A protein has these predicted regions:
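Compositionally biased amphipathic helical and low-complexity segments enriched in hydrophobic
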Residues: 5, 32-36, 342, 350, ...
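Short glycine/threonine-rich turn/loop motifs
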Residues: 53-213, 282-423, 483
């Protein structure tokens, strides 16, 4: 008798090995890991691309990368003057620029006060340069830089009169603006809809001349500078100079028969040299390269740039415009306007030994056409900040000699005036001591950081001021070739 089994018979095809059940799970994990790896690699690749080319990624990412790396997420192409060989007139102007024999002392040339090695500004830290017949007389103001002056507009007050053939005189424009409240100047803000009548443009600290030719002529007869006694004296020196033959070649054989014309053509030649020689306007600073996406700023420089443009902090860009124009011209770091800042009186200046003497800028004493327009008294031209970190003397009276001092004055003038001004006989701080009391209302107290009161917290910390100074150093051009 056959014994029957009680074990169930296996079903064909229904049996699975024990380890084979986890294989799909493993394959899924491998696929997931592969996808993660692809995402990571793609992310790293995109991150590397963003770091290298922040301008090629979406704005929020580019801004973040720029803040992290110091790159410019929005590079631009700057428009510069074409570089070409100097004309014959400019080459003559170059010789004139460096010729000390054109001065009464025989020791002072244009380059003595406008040194090429110092951004065509003063070569030392003197409050004002020495000149005169024996080079012992102190000047009235420190020389501004001659760089980038080819873009300086003519002096005017208020909006341009356009094609009006009967445009009012400067004095008439000034008189019509009397009593008009000066607009607040804020970094990055659009100008007010109604045009403001403000002085702007011109050369020298008070804008008293408009052309480089006029500017070059100014020191020739100034008794504390080149100190020549007359135009005839200068013309005679030009006729006796080793380059006199170039005058006759360029301006005709009778050029020396008219003394006024001789000197005028000489000053024109100096002006052409300043316009044509690229060392006067190279636009090759670190900031220019950063604007074009060719260089990166350090973290301190980048923080300084943000503070420079911050209307609630330094607000520097309210007057020292930092962005390129729509035409691609590099920023000039000035709005060409005039401000009354109330810097302390410099008692080291010879002219200030007279307690009744006040240098009032636009309304005198060196220009007289606006002396009755008292709303402009104590206003001086806003200079470009390009190459300012190479200077050793600041403001119209040379009272400060470092950027640290300048920043401290801006930051603490109103919150701690005793830090800068002396005390009067009554024991009170003599604020704005270089401006007569009747003109002190012209001093800027509305634009940051001057919009603080005594005892308020200053707009900037010490570290923030150091960062701004670090940024200002990026505005220095590369040194020009040695003359």
């Amino acid at each position: 008798m056959t014994e029957l089994s009680t074990s169930p018979a296996p079903s064909s095809g229904s049996s699975t090995p024990a380890g084979s059940a986890v294989q799909p799970v493993r394959r899924g994990r491998r696929l997931l890991l592969s996808l993660v790896a692809v995402v990571v690699v793609a992310g790293l690749g995109f991150g590397a691309f963003a770091l290298a080319f922040p301008a090629q990624v979406p704005d929020p990412i580019g801004e973040a990368v720029g803040n992290l790396t110091g790159a410019n997420p929005h590079p631009v192409t700057l428009t510069r003057l074409p570089v070409a060989p100097l004309s014959a007139v400019a080459l003559l102007g170059k010789q004139l620029f460096f010729d000390p024999k054109l001065s009464a002392s025989g020791q002072q040339s244009c380059a003595s006060c406008h040194s090429p090695a110092h951004a065509y500004g003063p070569p030392n830290d003197l409050d004002a340069q020495l000149g005169g017949t024996s080079m012992a007389l102190q000047g009235y103001r420190p020389p501004p830089s001659l760089m980038y002056l080819y873009r300086q507009p003519n002096f005017m007050i208020g909006p341009d009169q356009g094609e009006n053939d009967d445009a009012p005189s400067v004095a008439q424009l000034a008189a019509s603006s009397a009593g008009v409240v000066k607009a607040q100047k804020t970094a990055g803000a659009a100008p007010p809809a109604a045009p403001q009548m403000v002085p702007q443009g011109g050369l020298f600290w008070d804008g008293r001349v408009d052309t480089l030719q006029q500017q070059a002529f100014g020191p020739l007869l100034n008794p504390v500078e080149m100190a020549n006694t007359s135009i005839d004296t200068v013309a005679q020196k030009l006729e006796n100079a080793p380059y006199s033959k170039q005058f006759t070649q360029l301006f005709g054989p009778r050029i020396f028969s008219d003394k006024q014309l001789t000197v005028s053509e000489a000053m024109f030649a100096i002006a052409r040299y300043q316009v044509e020689d690229p060392s006067f306007h190279p636009y090759n600073s670190k900031y220019d390269r950063w604007l074009e996406g060719k260089e990166r700023l350090s973290q301190a420089e980048l923080r300084g740039l943000h503070l420079f443009n911050d209307p609630n902090k330094a607000n520097c860009a309210g007057c020292h415009l930092s962005k390129p124009g729509s035409d691609g011209l590099p920023p000039m770091f000035t709005d060409y306007q005039y401000e009354a800042l109330g810097v302390p009186r410099n008692r080291a200046l010879a002219q200030n030994r007279d307690p009744k003497f006040f240098d009032l800028g636009v309304c005198g004493p060196f220009r007289q056409d606006l002396k009755d327009q008292t709303q402009y008294c104590a206003m001086f031209l806003t200079p470009t900040l390009r190459n300012s970190a190479t200077r050793q003397v600041f403001f119209h009276n040379g009272v400060y000699h470092t950027l640290d001092q300048v920043m401290s004055f801006y930051n603490d003038r109103n919150t701690n005036p005793g830090k800068f001004y002396p005390k009067g006989a009554d024991g009170k701080v003599d604020k704005y001591d270089d401006i007569p009391a009747k003109y002190q209302k012209n001093v800027d107290v509305t634009d940051a950081p001057f919009d603080r009161n005594f005892g308020d917290k200053p707009a900037m910390t010490d570290q923030e001021m150091r960062d701004i100074i670090a940024f200002v150093h990026t505005l220095n051009d590369d040194p020009p070739p040695t003359h």
